[in-house]
Amino acid sequence: MKRSLNENSARSTAGCLPVPLFNQKKRNRQPLTSNPLKDDPGISTPSDNYDFPPLPTDWAWEAMNAELAPVMKTVDTGQIPHSVPRPLRSQDSIFNSIQSNTERSQGGWSYSDNNKNTSLKTWNKNDFKPQCKRTNLVANDGKNSCPMSSGAQQQKQFGIPEPPNLPRNKETELLRQTHSSKISGSTMRGLDKNSALQTFKPNFQQNQYKKQMLDDIPEDNTLKETSLFQLQFKEKANSLRIISAVIESMKYWREHAQKTVLLFEVLAVLDSAVTPGPYYSKTFLMRDGKNTLPCVFFEIDRELPRLIRGRVHRCVGNYDQKKNIFKCVSVRPASVSEQKSFQAFVKIADVEMRYYINVMNET
C-alpha cells in the first residue's frame, strides 16, 4: 500500500517511532510504517490502489476485525456500505454481503425460520411463461396445468401472500447473483438445494415443451399420403405386359385390338434357315402346327444368337397385321419348364384379353 506522507511530518504511534521500510538513498519512494494511523487523511483506501506489499499478520487481523463490524451491521439493517475494502474481506464477509444484496433486492421475497433463509421466488407468468402441458387442457376445463415449484408450495403452506412483481431486468440480475454465489465453492453450503433446482428448471421445461410440440403435430397429411401410397400398391399395376399366345390367337387379338400396342410371346419351332436382309436384319420362319409366321430381327444393339432348325424357340415382339410379319425384339431357345407352363399362360392371357376387349367395346 502506498502512503503519501510529508518528509518533515513526525508521528508517534503508541510510543513507537516510525521505521522506514525502504532505503531513501537508492529509491525515491515514500516510507511505510509498521503501525500506521487509521484516521490519517493522507492514506488512500484499498479500493483506489491495489499495488501493496505483504502486510504483518497482526495488523491485517486488527484491520479485518475492524471492518467486520460495519459489514454485520449492514446485514442486519439491510443496507450496503458505500466503500468497503475488498482485498481484506474474508469468504464469510463476501457471503454476508451477497446475502444482504439479495435481501435488499427481494424486499418481502424471503422469510427467516430458525436462521435459515428460505427462498420464496416463483416464476411470474407475465415475465417468464412456464411451459405447460397441452394434453391436460381438456381434462382441466381449459386451465393450464403448470408444475408448481417447491417455493410456491411452501408459500401456499405457510399462508404467505404473493410477492410483488419485479421488472424483468431486476429478476435477471437477481438470478445472476444467486448463480454466481452458488459457484463460489465454500459459500455454497448455506444455500438451499431447491433454489438450485429452480434455477435450471426453465431450460428443462423448455426442452420438454419442444419435444411435446413435435409430438402434437397433426398427422392428417402423413396419414393421407400413406393411405394413397398403399392404395396405389393395392390397385392392379398398369405396366407393360407380355401376352402369351399361339400364332392363331395372336392374329385374332391383334385384329380386335388395333388401337392398342400389344407385345406377344410366342413359342414355335424354327422351320427355315436364317437369312440376312437389308438394314442388318435376319429373317426366318416359325411354325406352330399348321400355322406359320414369318419373323424378322434387326441386329441394332445386339446380334441374333445361333438358332437351330427344328427346335422350339421363344420369340417376343409386335405383330404387324398389314405386312403379316412378326418383328422380334428377343429370340432364344425355349427351356423345358417354359414349354410345360406355356399352355397355362396362354389360357390366362385369353381371359384377360377378352375382358379388355369387352371394356374397350363398351366405351
UniProtKB/Swiss-Prot annotation:
Broad class of the protein's primary localization: nucleus
Region (Disordered): 1-51, 145-169
Tissue expression: Expressed in testis.
Compartments (UniProt record): Chromosome
The protein's role, per its UniProt record: Meiosis-specific protein required for homologous recombination in meiosis I.
Domain of life: Eukaryota
GO biological process, one term: regulation of meiotic cell cycle
Cellular component, GO annotation: chromosome
Protein keywords: Chromosome, Meiosis
Keyword rRNA processing appears in the UniProt entry: no
Subunit and interaction comment: Component of a multiprotein complex with MEIOB and RPA2. Interacts with MEIOB. Interacts with the complex BRME1:HSF2BP:BRCA2.
Protein name: Spermatogenesis-associated protein 22
Organism in which the protein naturally occurs: Macaca fascicularis (Crab-eating macaque)
Compositional bias ranges of the Polar residues kind: 1-12, 145-157
The UniProt record lists the keyword Translocase: no
